[in-house]
Structures are given as C-alpha cells and as structure tokens.
Amino acid sequence: MDKKKLIEELVEELNKYAYEYYVLGNSSVTDKDYDKKYYELVDLEKETGYKLPYSPTQRVGDVILPEFKKYTHKARLWSLDKAQTLEEIREWHNRNVKFLEEYNRTSDEELPPLKYILTKKFDGLTINLSYDENGVLVTGATRGTGAIGEDVTAQVKTIKSIPLKIDCHDFLEIHGEAIMTTEAFEKYNSEAETPLKNLRNGAAGALRNLNVAETAKRNLSAFFYDVGYKEGAPFKTYMEMLNFIKTKGFPMDDYIRECTTLDEIQKEIDYIRDIRFDLNYDIDGLVIAIDDIRTRDLLGYTVKFPKWAIAYKFEAQEATTKLLDVEWNVGRSGRVSPTAILEPVELAGVTVKRATLNNMDDIARKGVRLGAEVFVRRSNDVIPEIMGVVPESLEGTKEIEEPKVCPACGAHLVHEGVHIYCENTLGCKPQMVKTIVHFAGREAMNIAGFSEKTAEQLFEKLDIRDISDLYKLEYEKLLDLDKFGPKKAQNLLDAIEKSKDCTLEAFLYSLGIPNVGVKTAKDLVKRFESLENLEKATFEELVSVQDVGDIVARSIIEFFKEERTLKVINELLSLGVNPHYEKKEVLESPFMGKTVVVTGTLENYSRTSIKEKLESLGAKVSGSVSKKTDFVIAGEAAGSKYDKAKSLGVTILSEEEFENMI
C-alpha cells in the first residue's frame, strides 16, 4: 500500500479510537494495539515527511512558544448576566414573558411558548475552537475580551477529547470550557514541586503556558455547549445546536434539562446544588437559556450580556482567610495530624473555622505559615482543605512547628514517611477512645447506645485498653460511671452480648484495618468467606478483589502480621464473638452474569436498592455504557447514558419491563 495512504488510514483509525475512549468512555482496542499503531504512524511520518494537521502525533509537542498571538473571534463570546436568588430568575423570566406576549400580539409570525434549556456552568477557562471547510481544527483561542482572545492552538491540542477533525464542511466556531478534573488535579499535585491551588487555576494556567509539554502534564478535559459561528443553514433551537455538537464528536456533559416553569427550574437548581460536590470537576452554577433561536435574536443583547440567557450562581467553594493557629490531633491509628484554626469565613453556604493541613511536608510545599492569608477550598462535604497562601500576606508570619511529643499523652513520636505517629497505642486516650467507638459503631459491631462519652469513661475509670476488654465489663463497675444507673448499665451489657452474633463483614470492618471501609470489607468477605482465609491471603489474591489496589492489599497483609492484632482477634473469639458468613444464593434470572447500567430516576428504587437488587440477581452493575453493556434500565430524566445505549444498540428497559422480567 502507498505509504501516504497508509498514514491517512492510520490517522483516521487512531482518531476514531481516541473519540471512543475520551468522549464515549468506551475502548474498542487495547492500549497495546493502540500504541503499536501510534508508533507505526510516528515512524511513517518521519520516513515520508508527510504529516496531516489532524494527526494524533500533532497533539503534544515539546515546543516552547515565544509569545501568544491574538485571535479575533468570528462571533463575540458574551458574558452572562448573573442571579443568586430565585427572585432574580423570576424577574428575568417575567421580562421574557412580557416581551413574548407583546411581540405575539403585534406580529403575524408568533413566537413559540417559552422553553428554557438548563446546563451546568463550568468553572474552568472558556475556549473557542475554529474548524475550516475541511473540518480540520485550525485555531484554539481563549475568550479574552470576548472579541479578541489569545491563540492557544498548541495547548488546546493536548486535550485528548477534542477532535482534531470533524465531519463538517462549513467554517465553524464552537465554544466550550477547558477544565481540570479532581483526579488530574490530585495526580499533578502529588508530583509537582509547586502544587496548584484549585482546579480552575490548573486549567487556566495550563492553557496560558507557553511550554506546551507543561500543558500536557495537566491532562485537561473539556465540555462544549455552544456554536458561536457557523456558515450554512442556521439552527432553529438550542437543542438542535446541542445535538449538532454531539453528533460531531465533541465531549458534552450529561446534564441537559428542558424547563417551562419556574418550579421546574427551582427543582433543577436544588438538584444540581445537591450533587455539586459529588462531581469530579468544578461548577459554579447553572446556565438558563431560551431554546428558540428566533426568540433569542429578537430579544438581542445589552452592552454586556445576551438578554436570552442568565447564569444562576452558587455560593463560592473557595475563599481566602487568616490562619490563626494549628492544632495537632491524634487519630485512631495513632497518626498525629495538623488542623488549621481559621478566622471564620463563609464557604459554599457554611461557616468554616477549621481546615485540613495533612502533614508537615504538605505545609512546607504550600508555604503555609501562622498569620498568613490562606486559600481554603471545600468539596465533597468533607472538612475544607488549605490549598496555598496569598504571597503578599507572608510578612510578619511565623513558621509552623512540628510537635516533639504526642499532644495527647506526651509520649515519643516516630516518623513513618511523611506522617508522625504516637507509639503509646494502649495508653494514649484519643487513640483508644476512637478505636473503641469505631468498633462499637452501627456499621461495625452495632453496640446500641454506645457513645464517645461512654468510651472516654471506660478508658479513664475502668482502664479499658483494648476492644476485647468490652466483653469483660462487669455490672457493678459500670454503676461507678457518671450517669450510669442500673437500667443503663444492664442495657449496655445486653447490647454488648447481642453484638457477639455478627456478620463477618461487620466484624472485619470493626477491626479498623487501615484503608478498609464498609464496602471493601463486604468485597473481601465475598471473595474469602472466612477470617482464616483472609489472614492467609497473598498479595496477588487480594488485588484480584474488586476495588482492592496495592495500598489496600499491603495494609491488610501488614495488619495480619501484627502479633497484637492476632492476639486481640483470638481473644474476641474466645470471649464468644461469633462472626459468620452466609453465602447468599443468587437466584436464576435473565440478569445472571450480565452487565447492567441504571440511568435516570426510578419510581420504586433508590440507587442503592436497585444496585442491591441487581446484584442479588447475579448482575454486575456498571456506571458507564459500553459495547460490553447488556442492559440499560432507564428511569425518568434519563440522560446521555440512554442516548449512548441507543447508539450502541444496547437493550433498554423501562422500570416496568425490568420488574416483569424478574
């Protein structure tokens, strides 16, 4: 075959694989086969000197650009007017209603009833991509002033989900947002000399970096949502435009909703606010835009904003405040960790007074000092984290000092990697109290009525120094505790006795194995079925369990090597604790061994209950649709997973059809 022809075929094939992997989340080729074809293409391009502008080899270069050139957008990239209350949305909606009524009263060609399209407002860097009449990406640019941006074509090409060539023969400008996912952010920060402060700066800084290789290291993603300019036939609705974007292979977010009333808009705002911190990228609100393009054109623009769209903004999830002090606390494992005491600041609707600092290495890398202004970030409803300092605030600040002894018991501290630990396992109150509370917890041994206050008294007054000591408690001694009368003492003893009959997964979780949570405990029990089998498990056997990686496997092996661990377990068993495993019989069903994806809202099942139901039927529940998916169960407001299932020919079931099958 002619070598140029072979290059063209390889480019087409590799771009198809990239689209499947980075946009659809589904790969039809192994990494090994992809790499083989990629390097075959590299060699052919070197040999012939023939390189297509949309070849995947053109995505990443080691070039350092001398400067950014300016790019004049064909169509302006507008800012959006912003609202922070439903009342402001109502006022905007009422203006639209008034305009529509007045226009339809005086015009022969009536406008359709108002319909709004809701999409997420991404918190990254706006980009504008230009494709020529051959469908080839020719320019990537930042928003800039809205009229003129900076040419970041080389940087944009490092985003692997962005197509370098599309099936379109009209000149086109398409708008989107370059973002950094939390996974990419955490990976970059784990290796970077200077950590990034937030996801938005990670994306913006990458695209505005003249060193393209540095941009590539940040592993950016992108979502597209608007065609700014297109030669040829115009779109009639925004939904038609969004479908065009999707069919051309651009990455799009799953969330697109149609609303016609304020009540519907309010429900969507509440929904997105609830899931905001569960996303692996940042959003700062919702965009509400009129669907009908003719209505948009007639409404027009103010000097700054389009009148036909508005952004509902959420409370900020990042802020700056002053670091007042650092408090060192001892955890269940004995790890001594720093917590920042902050000048109170409002963050995502919550008053924040404390934040995570992780360890001394983290403090040094971020340059955090007492008295400095610090960047604080809140996500996933966990304790906020300090991401860095405001450099201008460092004058007159003090260094944070590492403790020399345990802040709780005064014992010697030891270093293990980047962390410090208290060695006084039995005599350090916070360690022992937290260990006992964890052991007695609802998802562990489920000792009813047990509290941290009770654990503290057991440690201080009854000299409880191990979890097995709980099963040696005596009625008369419990009466010596504060607020313990005969009834409360007996209730506690009864609850402790009842806890002896427990599931193996609850017992395993109660032991407090590092990095083993409730779900991992369940997965381990399903695989090994007995404590004895788990104790003997090899590293290879452990990592074969779903979601058990190298770190978890090593934690389990090290845990069962400890002489004290084995002594405590044997003592618990000798005291009558009886962890048992009942192998659940999986019923024969059409779902046995099948891969099932659930999308949308179901009437009779929560996400947890449908997952449990499917697993009881022998199905494997997946979070994404691919060629390997056997069934998709679609509820109300099913999103892109439904569309993808249709395009792949996957069997789609309604909730009723699913129930009829079982």
UniProtKB/Swiss-Prot annotation:
Its cofactor is Mg(2+); Mn(2+). GO terms for biological process: DNA repair; DNA replication. Zn(2+) binds at residues 406, 409, 422, 428. The active site is at 121 (n6-amp-lysine intermediate). SUPFAM superfamilies: BRCT domain (SSF52113), DNA ligase/mRNA capping enzyme, catalytic domain (SSF56091), Nucleic acid-binding proteins (SSF50249), RuvA domain 2-like (SSF47781). Pfam families: BRCT, DNA_ligase_aden, DNA_ligase_OB, HHH_2, HHH_5. Its EC number is 6.5.1.2. Keywords: DNA damage, DNA repair, DNA replication, Ligase, Magnesium, Manganese, Metal-binding, NAD, Zinc. CDD domains: BRCT_DNA_ligase_like, LIGANc. It catalyses: NAD(+) + (deoxyribonucleotide)n-3'-hydroxyl + 5'-phospho-(deoxyribonucleotide)m = (deoxyribonucleotide)n+m + AMP + beta-nicotinamide D-nucleotide. PROSITE patterns: BRCT, DNA_LIGASE_N2. Residues 586-662 form the BRCT domain. One of its GO terms (molecular function) is metal ion binding. One of its GO terms (cellular component) is cytosol. NAD(+) binds at residues 31-35, 79-80, 143, 177, 313. NCBIfam families: dnlj, PRK07956.1. PANTHER family: CHROMOSOME TRANSMISSION FIDELITY FACTOR 18, DNA LIGASE. DNA ligase that catalyzes the formation of phosphodiester linkages between 5'-phosphoryl and 3'-hydroxyl groups in double-stranded DNA using NAD as a coenzyme and as the energy source for the reaction. It is essential for DNA replication and repair of damaged DNA. Belongs to the NAD-dependent DNA ligase family. LigA subfamily. This is DNA ligase. It comes from Clostridium perfringens (strain 13 / Type A). The lineage of its organism: Bacteria, Bacillati, Bacillota, Clostridia, Eubacteriales.
